[in-house]
Amino acid sequence: MISWPNFIAQLFNGLALGALLALISSGLTIIYGTLGVLNLAHGAMFMLGGYAGYVAYTYTDSFIIAVIAGSAFVMVLGVLMERVIIRHFYHRPHEDQLLVTFGLSICFVEIARFFFGSLSKTIPPPPPFSGITSLGFMFYPTYRLAAVGIIAVALLALFLVLYRTRLGMIVRAGIEDAVMVESLGINVYRVFMIVFGIGAMAAGFAGIINAPIASLTPDMGEAILVQTFVVVVIGGVGSFPGAVLGGLIAGEIISITSMINPGYAYVMLFAVMTLVLVVRPHGLLGTRGRE
């Protein structure tokens, strides 16, 4: 018998996971929506962000510095990836994009394993958010509540960039018609570089925020990548609001199903994805956009 406090705790766990998936998926969806690149290395960006934050924390004992340093590292790595490798695959078949980004993902995982080993690493939560908080009817880890708030602020910042700045206007126009944007004299390749960097940074930032909740391992990006792609499909490719909505839905599905039977969490997640595709082939908030 499942008690109400346990059920509500699982709802909170689903909210925390959903917020994390929303942030990672928002980066992936704007990358694919703008650049048309299926980035299988996105999960590795999540993992590398966590490890970069771990290194920064080891030397500074500052969680804030760890977040800044880890996010900056992954953003720079994303920019370099776009300029050196990804740029040559914009007009190539998706199969080529999958192969090259899958290869990059394997390289990043093995590099992390070489430097950090296979044993898990952890970053403690910052002192103000350590311990547990009483919600009246139950106790809940303070950091998980804080993580939801931090990610919400990050999503709001990304929303403002996409919908309240000239760069965001160009990015959203590029999602609809990249050729039209280029015909207006805009350097789309510079925009692509910035978008890839922002998308990678979103994943890296999520990796650091998640580090005090789940241990860091070189393979941690693989499972999150699968969940992220499902979120993008549910929400709609290229849709930022869709990524947020899809992330929250996926988080609750995984959390609630895991409480009943952990073995069926992914089954239920893919079942919901299939149902969404049957009813709305372009996702809940997606449009036809890029083919």
Describe each region flagged by the PLM.
Residues 19, 26-50, 91-97, 167-170, ...:
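Short, non-helical or kinked segments that cap or interrupt transmembrane helices
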Residues 61-105, 111, 245-250, 280-281:
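Alpha-helical transmembrane segments within multi-pass membrane transporters and channels
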Residues 88-89, 93-164, 191, 256, ...:
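Transmembrane helix-bundle core of multi-pass membrane transporters
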Residues 17-18, 138-216, 240-246:
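Helix-loop-helix "hairpin" substructures at the membrane interface of multi-pass membrane proteins
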